[in-house]
Amino acid sequence: MLGVRAAGRTVVPGRITGRLSWRASLLTVKGRAACAEDGSVVLDSLWRRRAVLVSGKGGVGKTTLSAALAVAAARAGRPVLLAELSPDEGGPSALAGLVGANEAGPRVVAAGPNLSFVRLSAPEGHRLFLEETLPAKWLADAALRSKALRRFLEAGPALKEMGLMFQLLSLLRRKHADGRWVHPLTVVDLPATGHALALATLPRSILSLMPGGPVGRAVREGLDLLQDPARTGVVLTTLPEPLPVSETLALVGELKDVGLPLSAAVLNRMPEDPFTPESRAALERLLETHGPHRGQRALERLERARQARQRLAAGVAVPHWGLPELALTGVALVERLAEHLMSKLEGAALHPGQEATP
């Protein structure tokens, strides 16, 4: 039987399955293999921001990554709010179930030690804005009972995004009596790549119409938060395949155009590559001599993943890392990925008292 020595063991081509151990995934920073300390720096830097926006195309594991980031941060002692921005505010919440939140609505609920959950709501943001702007709460309640006003807020260009932004801003403003932030870190699961851009672009149309006054001030404050790399970071999620990486690289340019700070990129479901360059070359010679084997597809997938990682490294100027492909789903998958992220923090001390500037 043909065999090649790889990473200290014999690998038989016919037995390559593409499955991997979660402990074997590579953390890469700017295209090179990184040590655990590098991973610690990347995650610690993310967790010191006030808002982390997780974006990506559908089906790449964005929601699972959002949950895993929040769970890992909470277990590292960082109070974290996991926020869901859903286009269907009344529908079921997959994210709430992944972290054990008992309800999914505009009210913040506890989901575990150091972990809270909320579903951002445009109507809730509108209500908060009116309460802040009008001289009495009853005036805001009366205004929201107006069907005409509600229809305008629901249909007006950029007004939905303004409501979502204002609720997020209100949550980030909250402080304890001693001045500490109630939510020093908020991880936001965006429903699609376009929503990250919409949060930054559509409110500009409001500013062009109302540059001053309470509306203009609120929108400007929200944009200042989203575009400040010290307080906000975008994490792009993709898969190690040609098309998803191409879409991600296109989004990198769009984020730059609207001023949203990209902080990291994640290649999800990375297959394990057990081969060194030398053993891979030896295997290719064997395949050329003896023809295809049952592991041919898995080898081709490894090559696609390698090329995808190289393309991503060449196309982004921020740290990126791989998350392993696991035979798990739901809460079990989130738990294992959170453990994987936590392993990158070994040897790095978190300082919960240090926070980004407001």
Where in this protein do the model-derived segments appear?
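Extreme N-terminal basic, low-complexity initiation segments
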Residues: 2-13
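C-terminal lobe/tail of nucleotide-utilizing enzymes
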Residues: 28-30, 35-46, 227, 231, ...
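Pre-Walker A (Motif I) flank of P-loop NTPase domains
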Residues: 48-52
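Conserved beta-strand segments of the P-loop GTPase G domain that flank and frequently precede/overlap
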Residues: 54-55, 83-85, 189, 235-239, ...
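Walker A/P-loop NTP-binding active-site region of P-loop NTPases
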Residues: 55, 60-120, 200-203
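Conserved nucleotide-binding/hydrolysis micro-motifs of P-loop NTPases
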Residues: 87-90, 122-126, 192-195, 240-244, ...
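Phosphate/Mg2+-binding loops and adjacent switch elements
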Residues: 138-242, 247-250
